[in-house]
Amino acid sequence: MLEDIERIKENDYDYYRYLYLGEAVGLGNNVYNMSTFHAIETLPSDDKLIGISFALDGGHQQSATAVCAFGITAKGKVILLDTWYYSPAGQIVKKAPSQLSQDINSFINRIVDKYKVPVLQYTIDSAEGALRNQMYLDFAIRWHPVAKLKKVTMIDSFQSLLAQGRFYYLNTENNKIFVEEHKMYRWDEKTIKSDNPNVIKEDDHTCDTANILY
């Protein structure tokens, strides 16, 4: 516990002040301190990848669907390996759940074949029933539905990981959308001082995958 506190103090002093000293911390209305997102070009040679966790945020008629592959290392780091992203915006014919199921399964197989480590978990927003059922029907992949809690509670779990200096992402074209959405992720100023602050629900699909990871 003391080691975790010291790690947070070293990696994200603002979050340490907020969490342990009870001080007001100014990030404006930005949710995350982007200096805690560490880009890497290759996987670390001294910290073995032991498994992969997939997290899925399902979209609807006008909303994007995102799947992120998070690698877990022996030393407890979390590395974003790859991102699959589909947006129906501006498309006359939207993809059906049966088509999304095929695309996502191909993404999963490509990642597993590349890294050759076990899949530790599949997590999905509990509201996304159609795609979850479709993937079980097509491939017997059982996604674990995660009920959404208060937004601030879900964000805190990922924020703690960031503050401990344990989050990394491969600096690839596919992962740019993850970084950009987290840069733009903001609290709604109308709710920021309330008992239940909420975020602005725009272009936040990869953010939601990170929020349901744990």
Where are these regions (language model features)?
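Acidic, Mg2+-coordinating catalytic module of metal-dependent nucleases/exonucleases
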Residues: 196-214
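Anionic group-transfer/hydrolysis microenvironments
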Residues: 57-59, 127, 210
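A residue-level signal for conserved active-site and pocket-lining positions in enzyme catalytic cores
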Residues: 20, 67, 122, 182, ...
